A protein has these predicted regions:
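Short alpha-helical transmembrane segments in multi-pass integral membrane proteins
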Residues: 1-21, 65-121, 177-244, 285-325
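Transmembrane helical elements of multi-pass membrane transporters/channels
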Residues: 17, 28, 51, 80-84, ...
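Juxtamembrane/transmembrane-helix interface segments of polytopic membrane transporters
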Residues: 55, 63, 130, 134-138, ...
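Short loop-to-helix capping motifs
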Residues: 4, 40-41, 69, 145, ...
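Membrane-water interface regions at transmembrane-helix termini and the short interhelical loops
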Residues: 31-39, 59-68
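Small-residue-rich hydrophobic transmembrane alpha-helices
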Residues: 25-44, 151-215, 248-270
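Short runs within selected transmembrane alpha-helices of multi-pass transporters and secretion channels
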Residues: 17-36, 44-52, 73-86, 170, ...
Length: 325
């Protein structure tokens, strides 16, 4: 992926540490999904925010304080994800013991496994397809040089801190839509989507008031003050992406709502749209606009996905309402 030779070793170390954290990622998604399924979407969100804040604090301690560099960043991610899993386990044992398997519940049920695979595999493929576009964009950015690699990495860490809220609103909508579909209360689904969009827009205003004036200061959490060029480029990335956060918020709400309604194959196609958009940006926009083109990689992908998801959700919603009638 055109990784510069001078950062290849560090990138390899960080990647290996990320792979080591995969069991924690799987465990968190499994446990938080179970908690949400019982109607509690707040607690997993609080745990995720806690883990994100701990990640940032550990980054400062391990990278700036102890000078561990990329190893410190990887260890911080590893530890913060582990903490989120422990918090989920603690909450289940304390408040939701119904989720702890007992007796025959520990036995495998082939029919239930089949249902889970039918819903889960398309969702997994969706993220894999989206990742192809991200790899293409990363490759195009790496070819620009180490300054841009550092700017991209720093901006992504801050971006994920802010955008995890959109992700959790979407995940909550998946549970909400699934529950109301089971009860055939389709009007509540429409009300929930509208309410979540309003919540998303309020949160967007909050992020704008933070990111637009303070993006440079945020970047200094991960970048040495002496690397002014990296700070400038990373802040530019954050500001451009922030303008399009409503598009990202709408994407997560509609995509997860469609998944909650049982049409994972349909939501997977939005991932294809994202992949096509990022590949197009990598092949044409980055060569023409350099770093500015990279900054528009995510926004273009979000808009393309929305152009598919909006009519797809409206069609699906009308289709389901006709079935009820």
């Amino acid at each position: 992926v055109n990784t510069p030779k001078e950062v290849f070793d560090d990138a390899y170390i960080f990647l290996m540490l990320q792979f080591a954290a995969i069991p924690f990622t799987i465990a968190y998604n499994l446990l938080s999904g179970q908690i949400r399924a019982l109607g509690n979407s707040k607690q997993p969100f609080y745990f995720l925010i806690t883990a994100s804040v701990i990640n940032i604090i550990l980054d400062g301690i391990l990278i700036l304080g102890m000078g561990l560099g990329v190893e410190g960043a990887g260890i911080a991610t590893w530890l913060s994800q582990g903490i989120s899993v422990l918090l989920c386990i603690w909450f289940i044992k304390k408040k939701m013991q119904i989720l702890i398997p007992k007796g025959e519940e520990r036995n495998f049920d082939n029919k239930k496994i089949s249902i889970l695979l039918n819903n889960g595999v398309p969702m997994g493929l969706q993220f894999s397809i989206t990742a192809i576009g991200l790899i293409m964009l990363q490759s195009a950015n790496n070819a620009l040089g180490t300054v841009y690699v550092a700017a991209f990495t720093a901006s992504m860490r801050i971006k994920y801190l802010f955008t995890c809220v959109f992700e959790n609103i979407g995940v909550a909508m998946a549970t909400y839509c699934g529950q109301n579909l089971g009860a055939w209360k389709l009007d509540r689904i429409g009300q929930g989507v509208r309410a979540s969009i309003r919540m998303m827009l309020v949160y967007f205003v909050f992020t704008f008031l933070l990111i637009y004036p303070f993006a440079d200061e945020m970047m200094m959490l991960f970048v040495d003050k002496g690397e002014a060029e990296v700070v400038t480029y990373a802040a530019q990335f954050m500001r451009i992406a922030n303008y399009f956060y409503p598009c990202l918020g709408l994407l997560t709400i509609l995509r997860y709502s469609i998944q909650g309604l049982g049409y994972s194959n349909l939501s997977m196609l939005s991932g294809v749209m994202e992949m096509i958009a990022r590949c197009g940006v990598s092949l044409w926009l980055v060569p023409a606009l350099a770093w500015t083109g990279v900054c528009f990689g995510d926004p273009v992908a979000w808009v393309m996905a929305d152009l598919f998801l909006i009519p797809a959700f409206l069609w699906l919603y009308k289709h389901l309402k006709k079935e009820v009638l």
